[in-house]
């Protein structure tokens, strides 16, 4: 009996080793920086009011939906490359540049990913702000690069760029990437100032990327400067003001040689046909985004004033979201009412601007929760 148990034990150990050893062997083959890389911190909800992802609260216009429907039956075929060229031409016209200056991508993230994978290499150093869009750090860690972060300066109800530090640190890096307006503060950073862009472009050893995901809300751009400073790139998206988040449409505005280099790592089929049709149709008729921006701006003021009236520390914004600082769990309070917001760091929260009714609901429900917490 004792002999049989010993055999069973040895067999069990061998069985485990057979499966564990290959797993360890595979891990040893994966680059160390990739094993230790950061992941996108993402929590979603299936139902409720979505004010946690900076989405547009408005559905795409019916004319875009109708255009997409016409192509759904063609899913068995790859789209003709002419469609991608049409998208590039329209994005160029919208951005007041030439088509050869447009790199089309699967969302702005597709552009950022292409930049990290093609214009920097493991061991390079990236410069960005803190706080800023979290995917910069994710892509940096996945690529095995180092990161220098310049802390933004709090200035009453706004946040400001630490310009002197940014320019000094730029001399040490291969890539500078700045979201302007900034996410998650909602504040303008470089304000499209040509002098600052020029200094950054001249100081850095590599490239300067300005992420203009919220360009339509901010109203300023550095895109004209790509002709004066050929190492400057501008990233844009159709996810925000264009209300096309799940269609995953974006583009980069850059020097022709940079665009050619980025295009080598992509195909004419990367953007799915329905998305391409949505993007083309939207860029052919972009006037609707003015209404989106105007309504969001109006609702932002409603939410801002309402939160201020609740004695919350809320920062001003030129985007489609607000930043709040509070040591209570505002996320948990609002989730009890089916409202999702984004919890960030050090008691900071980001709330997307929704419809007027949604903004008023946030104010009402948060007011109830805060009153209850104060009475305990």
Curated annotation (Swiss-Prot):
A biological process from GO: L-histidine biosynthetic process
Secretion signal, residue range per the UniProt entry: none
Cofactor(s) needed: pyridoxal 5'-phosphate
Record-listed N6-(pyridoxal phosphate)lysine modification sites: 240
Highest taxon, organism lineage: Archaea
Keywords linked to the UniProt accession: Amino-acid biosynthesis, Aminotransferase, Histidine biosynthesis, Pyridoxal phosphate, Transferase
Enzyme Commission code(s) on record: 2.6.1.9
HAMAP family, per the entry: HisC_aminotrans_2
Name recorded for this polypeptide: Histidinol-phosphate aminotransferase
Species whose genome carries this gene: Saccharolobus solfataricus (strain ATCC 35092 / DSM 1617 / JCM 11322 / P2) (Sulfolobus solfataricus)
């Amino acid at each position: 009996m004792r002999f049989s148990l010993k055999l069973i034990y040895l067999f069990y150990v061998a069985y485990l080793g057979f499966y564990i050893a290959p797993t360890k062997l595979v891990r040893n083959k994966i680059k160390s920086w990739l094993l230790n890389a950061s992941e996108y911190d993402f929590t979603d909800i299936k139902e409720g009011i979505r004010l946690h992802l900076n989405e547009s609260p408005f559905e795409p216009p019916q004319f875009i939906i109708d255009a997409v429907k016409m192509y759904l039956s063609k899913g068995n075929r790859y789209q003709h490359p002419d469609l991608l060229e049409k998208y590039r031409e329209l994005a160029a016209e919208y951005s007041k540049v030439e088509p050869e200056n447009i790199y089309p991508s699967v969302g702005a993230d597709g552009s950022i990913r292409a930049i990290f994978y093609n214009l920097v290499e493991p061991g390079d150093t990236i410069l960005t702000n803190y706080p800023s869009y979290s995917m910069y750090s994710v892509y940096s860690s996945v690529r095995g690069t180092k990161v220098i972060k310049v802390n933004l300066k709090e200035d009453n109800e706004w946040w400001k760029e630490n310009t002197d530090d940014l320019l000094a640190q730029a001399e040490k890096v291969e890539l500078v990437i700045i979201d302007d307006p900034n996410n998650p503060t909602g504040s303008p950073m470089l304000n499209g100032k040509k002098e600052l862009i020029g200094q950054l472009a001249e100081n850095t050893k590599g490239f300067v990327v300005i992420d203009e995901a919220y360009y339509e809300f901010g109203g300023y751009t550095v895109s004209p400067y790509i002709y004066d400073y050929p190492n400057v790139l501008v990233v844009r998206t159709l996810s925000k003001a264009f209300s096309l988040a799940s269609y995953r449409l974006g583009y980069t505005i850059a020097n022709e040689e940079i665009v050619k280099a980025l295009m080598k790592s992509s195909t004419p089929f990367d953007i799915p046909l329905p998305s391409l049709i949505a993007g083309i149709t939207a860029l052919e008729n972009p006037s609707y985004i003015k209404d989106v921006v105007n309504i969001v701006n109006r609702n932002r003021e409603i939410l801002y004033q309402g939160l201020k009236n609740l004695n919350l520390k809320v920062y001003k914004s030129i985007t489609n979201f607000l930043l709040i600082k509070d040591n209570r769990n505002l996320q948990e309070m609002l989730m009890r009412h089916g409202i999702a917001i984004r919890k960030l760091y050090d008691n900071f929260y980001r709330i997307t601007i929704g419809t007027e009714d949604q903004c008023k609901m946030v104010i009402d429900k948060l007011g109830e929760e805060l009153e209850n917490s104060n009475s305990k």
